C-alpha cells in the first residue's frame, strides 16, 4: 500500500496542509510530521496526516493552530488510526484529511526555506539528526539506539504508565524539544538531501543530559512509503 510522505511548511489558511505545521488533535497541541497520500486504490485516494499518537483517540478532530489557538472553523480531518498502547510498537496517529484539503509537493521547511525530502533513512550510531517542532523549533541530536522500550504516561493525567516498544533515542546536543513538538519530523541531512527518520514522541533526562525519543518511519505500519525525488 504505497504512501507518499511529505514534510514541509506552515499551513496556508483553509486549503493547503504541510508537514511541520502546528495542529490541534483532540485536546493536544502537536506538530504534523508528514502528509501522506494513500494510492493503493486509485478510485479512492486518501490524503493523510501523520503525527504523534499519545493522548489521541479515534475520531478526534484535527484543526490548524493559528497563533496560540486552534482555528475550529477549519477542520483538517479526523483521526482514523491510533498506535499508542502498552506493549505495542510506536507512538503515532493517522488523520484522514477532508476531500477539500490540498497537500503539497515533497518539501520540508528547515525552517526558513523549502527543501526537497529525498527519501527515508535508518540511522547509524553517532549520526547527527535534527528534529523540527512548532514549539521548540530545530534541535540537533546525536543518534544513540534503536528498538528501545520507553515508559510513557498512559494518559495526559500521568497517573499510570505504559511501555512503548520499537522506539529510537538520541541525545539533544543543541536546542530543545518541548510541548507541542510531538509528532514533528526527525530527519537526516545527507549529501543527497534531507531524509525522513521518524516522528517526535517525547523526551527523557539523565542528569543534565536530555534525550529525544521518536518513532521510526518503519513503525508506521500498514503502508509502504514512496518518496518523490
What are these regions (language model features)?
Residues 1-13:
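Autoinhibitory propeptides
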Residues 17-163, 188-189, 201, 227:
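Serine endopeptidase catalytic core focused on the charge-relay Asp
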Residues 165, 169-201:
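Glycine- and charge-enriched low-complexity intrinsically disordered segments
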Residues 187-229:
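C-terminal subregion of chymotrypsin/trypsin-like serine protease catalytic domains
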